[in-house]
């Protein structure tokens, strides 16, 4: 890469000499920038190509073709689109015109991002905005002095007074319905009394008010639903209590006879084979649970007598028996570990010894005991042989005498 092209990033005054050969080749008839000979070569890959376009002049801006509407035309358009507040505000005040004008002039493109072009664009935009504000002020003065506007406001006030009341639509007693009905007819007056220059703010205020009213109505409906639910539940509870009282006052003999049979049900939680083998604490728990079950059976005789025994109750009984057997197995395993710990001298006094430690110490103790056994057996064999030798010698001495 030549040195002259590398200096283009640091100083923009040398752009005419350093960048021109990459776009304008040597021509004797049209020599615009008086470039040097021998520099006609394509641009390097690392060269910033988009900076070259800053040297090109920007074309003149075309004038705006949009014409401003008169007051009568604006009022006619408002009367056509009276149902939609957003459309009314957009046609009366033309709030989005300045934004669309700015977006149409300032084009975000690398071809028009030069410093001189940006300055010209800012100047044109400021002039157009100033002329636009002046035209709007004239429209405000014309509309305030116009009689059509006053008659239109009168028509709106009469139409607002003829609106249907919310009590006709919502027959339920609402706490804040009067407040909402008072706020509703004053909305169009507030929207139209504001000048056209503040159309966006008035539109947003009206939308906010509508949203607040909708939220209030939803909250009121939710409160009504909650109140209705409370009333229904209270009535159901009262009916249920009355039914229970009537059943308790006038019990039938057939139901009492069947309940007497259901009191002798078998307790699946306590097996006769394993009841006496359980520890005292577990036995007390089972007895207390059985007493609680019997008391609950006595309290709810009618419901248990009328409803037959289902598969769910059988599953619960099976699960209960399984839990009892599992507790017994765990207790037996724990007791066996405690007994093994007491037999090992290294862990006998350690009550908090883990099961792994107990097993390791037990294996070590077994190996040591096996070695002692072999040693003692060898000593025993030696002593036996020695005793035999002594007996044989004793016999020899006796025979010699």
From Swiss-Prot:
PROSITE patterns: BHLH. Residues 233-247 have a biased composition (Basic and acidic residues). Keywords: Activator, DNA-binding, Glycoprotein, Nucleus, Transcription, Transcription regulation. GO terms for molecular function: DNA binding; DNA-binding transcription factor activity, RNA polymerase II-specific; protein dimerization activity. A motif (9aaTAD) lies at residues 76-84. SMART domains: HLH. It is found in: Nucleus. Residues 205-230 have a biased composition (Acidic residues). Glycans are attached at residue 58. Residues 288-297 have a biased composition (Low complexity). Residues 317-369 form the bHLH domain. Residues 376-397 are annotated as: Leucine-zipper. It comes from the Eukaryota. Efficient DNA binding requires dimerization with another bHLH protein. Binds DNA as a heterodimer with MAX. PANTHER family: MYC PROTO-ONCOGENE (PTHR45851). The 9aaTAD motif is a transactivation domain present in a large number of yeast and animal transcription factors. Transcription factor that binds DNA in a non-specific manner, yet also specifically recognizes the core sequence 5'-CAC[GA]TG-3'. Activates the transcription of growth-related genes. This is Transcriptional regulator Myc-2. The gene is mycb.
